[in-house]
Amino acid sequence: MTLTLNRQLLTSRQILVAFSGGLDSTVLLHQLVQWRTENPGVTLRAIHVHHGLSANADAWVTHCENVCQQWQVPLVVERVQLAQEGLGIEAQARQARYQAFARTLLPGEVLVTAQHLDDQCETFLLALKRGSGPAGLSAMAEVSEFAGTRLIRPLLARTRGELEQWALAHGLRWIEDESNQDDSYDRNFLRLRVVPLLQQRWPHFAEATARSATLCAEQESLLDELLADDLAHCQTSQGTLQIAPMLAMSDARRAAIIRRWLAGQNAPMPSRDALVRIWQEVALAREDASPCLRLGAFEIRRYQSQLWWIKSITGQSETIVLWQTWLQPLELPAGLGTVQLTAGGDIRPPRADEAVSVRFKAPGLLHIVGRNGGRKLKKIWQELGVPPWLRDTTPLLFYGETLIAAAGVFVTQEGVAEGENGVSFVWQKTLS
């Protein structure tokens, strides 16, 4: 049998293969191993994600290790925990998998996955069930951007039946995930109950849905081209979206712009209802309001007549973090990242008798460099254009009870270095 994967997509010499040990990924890895034989410059690695959902998960790891050892493919095993609130098990598992893939990819490597034509049909039907538009109905692309590289699906034009023929012809062994028989999961319900009926009635139903998905993708690509100038006009250098240019747009055009802006932020595709709420409840809220719409772990906010897509962060106004070894980086709470004092800068280092801490609020009138007179911190934030949601999560450096600096924003007159021995207060963020 000849290789069934689309070799024209495999332009990279470094490949990371998502390997569950099931039929699809076993055939994919086997074909890539054969392709490597024909192309000695190719480097293959595999990754297996242990979700911890099945009592057989450890046995699956052993199976994958044995297969990869036999085929001389280095294997990475990533163990993940599912704890994302508000998501079903399927969505949690998928999210954890792709986060593991992103962490494991090496520079220059592409990710290759084993989705096939039947998977594409299921994805299309799931999008149809959700009431998706052309973007959702485009289903999966053979090549897409992922984690700064590419995600390639070289089996997308092949049916599961073709993959099974390959596996049987080559004597391959694979695992069967018992959860695949549980039709309480939407995708399994389609695979086990719905698609077989449709295929029985219309044998080429999967191919037809794939063509529809391709047509939807073409329409979406055309819309991207036609709306590129509008999006560029509305979007700022900070990645925010200006509201004013969208006021005169039709509802459909405005919604398309907001969708594309969110896609650029790597946000999940919003529902039609969410798009209406973004415009009505956030963009058009009262001028004196501070509107916020939660979408999963993120928020859409309005500030200075712009829409902002931000990670939800718990305010830290009551938090005080002692920094006893200030020569070392300090980890901040709530996943805010780390801060450190580095040599060279306009902040004086602490004296031996000064306790160093990081806080997120400061009382009284403050005197900052570049401003005359004293001001309360709230007024300083307003004057410097710091968005409200950053005001109680921006690290403030204190020596004793004296505010010295706000990371990346200002230095107080009490914190100014004298001479050439200053330091910088550097904040390494982990959240957008």
From Swiss-Prot:
Gene3D superfamilies documented for this protein: 1.20.59.20, HUPs
Binding site for ATP: 20-25
GO biological process: tRNA modification
Catalytic activity: cytidine(34) in tRNA(Ile2) + L-lysine + ATP = lysidine(34) in tRNA(Ile2) + AMP + diphosphate + H(+)
Swiss-Prot/TrEMBL keywords: ATP-binding, Cytoplasm, Ligase, Nucleotide-binding, tRNA processing
GO molecular function, one term: tRNA(Ile)-lysidine synthase activity
Listed SUPFAM superfamilies: Adenine nucleotide alpha hydrolases-like, MesJ substrate recognition domain-like, PheT/TilS domain
CC per GO annotation: cytoplasm
EC code: 6.3.4.19
Pfam families, alphabetized: ATP_bind_3 (PF01171), TilS (PF09179), TilS_C (PF11734)
Cellular localization per UniProt: Cytoplasm
CDD domains xref list: TilS_N
Main location, first listed in the record: cytoplasm
NCBIfam families, sorted: lysidine_TilS_C, lysidine_TilS_N, PRK10660.1
Record remark: domains: The N-terminal region contains the highly conserved SGGXDS motif, predicted to be a P-loop motif involved in ATP binding.
Function of the protein: Ligates lysine onto the cytidine present at position 34 of the AUA codon-specific tRNA(Ile) that contains the anticodon CAU, in an ATP-dependent manner. Cytidine is converted to lysidine, thus changing the amino acid specificity of the tRNA from methionine to isoleucine.
Similarity section: Belongs to the tRNA(Ile)-lysidine synthase family.
UniProt name for this protein: tRNA(Ile)-lysidine synthase
Species annotation: Shigella flexneri
GN (gene name): tilS
